Regions:
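Hydrophobic/aromatic beta-strand elements that line small-molecule binding cavities or substrate pockets
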Residues: 19, 51-54, 76-82, 107-115
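A conserved amphipathic terminal alpha-helix motif
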Residues: 129-168
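A short, structured loop/turn motif at beta-sheet edges
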Residues: 25-26, 56-57, 81-88, 112-122
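Intrinsic-disorder/low-complexity, polar/charged segments enriched in Ser/Thr/Lys/Arg/Asp/Glu/Gln
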Residues: 12-18, 25, 61, 75, ...
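Hydrophobic ligand-binding cavity/cleft-lining segments
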Residues: 1-48
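Beta-strand/loop substructures that line and gate deep hydrophobic ligand-binding cavities in soluble
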Residues: 92, 96-145
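Hydrophobic pocket/interface hotspot
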Residues: 28, 38, 62, 80, ...
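Short beta-edge strand/loop motif at the mouth of beta-sheet-based domains
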Residues: 16, 36-75, 167-168
Length: 168
């Protein structure tokens, strides 16, 4: 089970959660940066991610589709702003590939990975919002519970990479 850790927002209008993931940082990184792995965990069940298109470099695509149990479909288009291998990712939906602005955007997200003191990976996920209303909307959508569930799924996906047959 992904163990909750206490983390505090580092900027105004930010929501953040932290977990210790019982898997090596490299495996957690792969789950964030490889489309087929991201699809396994990125949305809390019973929702799923049937499509993911990732070009993990500044300005590259971060496009996903979320599918709900009743046929709902949410397309999410964004870009990566920063990619520091096995350490940090920053992405936003304020732009699409090539830094083309799109609408008002919802958030800029970041992921920080580091080695946990007693093994595993320290995982921090933050979402920074343009407005107080946007942040409150994200809270009401279930930010903490949803990302807590996704962190459990992330841990499961990362652990699946530990099988010698699946390592590259």
């Amino acid at each position: 089970m992904a163990t909750p850790i206490d983390v505090k927002p580092s900027a105004p209008l930010e929501l953040v959660i932290g977990r210790i993931i019982d898997a090596p940082r490299r495996a957690v990184w792969r789950c964030w940066t490889e489309a087929e792995l991201l699809k396994q965990w990125y949305c809390p069940k019973p929702w799923s991610v049937p499509e993911a298109d990732l070009d993990v470099r500044p300005g590259g695509r971060f496009n996903t589709v979320f599918a709900g149990p009743d046929g709902e479909r949410m397309e999410n288009k964004g870009i990566w702003l920063e990619s520091v291998p096995e350490t940090r990712l920053v992405f936003t939906d304020f732009f699409t590939e090539g830094f083309v602005p799109q609408g008002e955007g919802f958030m800029t997200g970041y992921v920080e990975l580091s080695d946990a003191t007693r093994g595993g990976t320290r995982f921090v996920w933050g979402a920074r919002h343009r407005t107080e209303a946007g942040m409150r909307q994200h809270e009401e959508m279930g930010f903490e519970a949803g990302w807590g569930a996704a962190a459990e799924q992330l841990e499961e996906a990362a652990k699946s990479l530990l099988s010698p047959a699946l390592q590259d």
